[in-house]
């Protein structure tokens, strides 16, 4: 009985010891697990622990969870200077957003040595600016005025050229003698204004057509371009003058210095001159115009004859 009790005691004790070892081991094993969990948690806390920024030494940093491209080199971000850096990597100077900040150039202000020396330069600059603005404002108006002046200049040149051609001196041509026709015959003489009786054509001068005709030159220094027209016009004007006034003389303005120049008074009633020129009845041969000279077989049959 004692042995069983000892065995039981030993067994219980052993069991207790085993249980104690078991539970002790369990407890001890639980302590080892806690240590491992603690170590893992410490590692996680170390990752989340705020690090100093290597650029500005600020503790306002964070670990990048999603923006990590390489787990062996975790990425951190500094909220102060807004820069990223990686552990064991190169510090980037590019800010978030990729903005490129250019360094502002400091403007060196030139201290004026003397105010009096700078005043003339400033006034000259103001004058230059005013001249540039005035030239810029008037450039459009000058361009439009140039086009208008060019057109008016061309028109003026054409008018002056025509005037020069008209006023150019032609040998033997007299501008005041614009009323001369033919070989120096005056239109007033042809109308009978220069005669004593006034002439038959004295009233024709009041018509506007005659006044318009008087302003047209027909001759140049007493010489016509077409000699036949000149002769015809001269003969007709002489006949009109003699019909209007038989005693009127035809005056030649170009030869007024010679008193003997001019036609002598013609008298149709006198025996002077060829009377056969105007008396056609004396030279008509009645035998030539008789019926016997124009008779023919055809006319006899038809009964028609020429007078």
UniProtKB/Swiss-Prot annotation:
GO cellular component terms listed in the entry, alphabetical order: nucleus
Transmembrane domains' residue ranges: none
Main location: nucleus
Subcellular location as annotated: Nucleus
Residues that, per the record, bind Zn(2+): 53, 56, 78, 81
Domain of life of the native organism: Eukaryota
Biased composition (Basic and acidic residues): 124-133
Region (Disordered): 96-147
ZnF (Dof-type) residues: 51-105
Listed GO MF terms: DNA-binding transcription factor activity; transcription cis-regulatory region binding; zinc ion binding
InterPro entries reported for this sequence: Dof, Znf_Dof
Bias kind Low complexity: ranges: 134-147
Start-end of Polar residues biased regions: 109-123
Biological process terms in GO annotation: regulation of DNA-templated transcription
Xref: PROSITE patterns: ZF_DOF_1 (PS01361), ZF_DOF_2 (PS50884)
Entry keyword set: DNA-binding, Metal-binding, Nucleus, Transcription, Transcription regulation, Zinc, Zinc-finger
Function: Transcription factor that binds specifically to a 5'-AA[AG]G-3' consensus core sequence. Enhances the DNA binding of OBF transcription factors to OCS elements.
Protein name stated in the entry: Dof zinc finger protein DOF5.4
Organism taxonomic ancestry: Eukaryota, Viridiplantae, Streptophyta, Embryophyta, Tracheophyta
Gene transcribed to yield this protein: DOF5.4
